[in-house]
Amino acid sequence: MGKAIVIIDFNNLFRGSIMNITQEQYKNLFTNVIEEILQKNENNISEILVRLYGGWYQGHNLTNMASDVQTKVQQIDLFPIIKDKKKYDGSIEVVSTQYGLSEIWYNTLQEKAGIPRLRIDEEHQDTGCEQRKEICPVHILQKFLQKKATICRNPGCKTEHSKVFYRREQKMVDTMMTCDIITYSAEEDVAALYIVSDDIDLFPGIAISKVKNNSIDMNLFVRTTQTKLAYQQILSTYNINIKSLEL
């Protein structure tokens, strides 16, 4: 009997602060995916491995977000599952190593000084501020963010763009998921692969994995109907099932 692998793009999936996601919401997500797996593959698998990907490390330190996710996930007891007198083992893991490697990929959540320059959509800008840009918040913000060295124009204020604004970015997470999708799909004992993500950067890797192993049951759960409609046709060409997932 084979395995079903579930790859969940955690930060991409949930909106707002991850810290506000409840344990019950996590459980509902896992349960919905597992039910889909068993409906299609109950006779092909005996084990389900759920892997959660995200920017879990800032430097070499586990982030507060990662600790919160780990704590809540560890309290969810779904396995083993008994259905029609058959037992399905499994696990749910917050992962920081890719399949086939033992090293942890650190520094997957990075802070960068400043915010990229904003562009104004002229079609949606009202003409009322055209002659008074100096008091229009849209133009003030756009001008302040033009360069990272920009200083506040208020007399006596020395606030600098790059010192007051910063952004956080995930690094390597998409690449790690793509590597795992390709690697897992090549394993003989993996009967089904389920990817839960709205990130279109993963789609080429999903497609080539299915081409290399057409026998694997490949499934993609996306958050938005818009993503589903935009990519359903091309993914169905490769016999990849795509559906919207209610959270």
Task: Please describe what each predicted stretch is.
Residues 1-150, 161-167, 211-212, 221-223:
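Domain-level signal for Mg2+-assisted phosphodiester chemistry and nucleotide/NA-binding surfaces
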Residues 120-247:
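Nuclease catalytic cores that cleave nucleic-acid phosphodiester bonds
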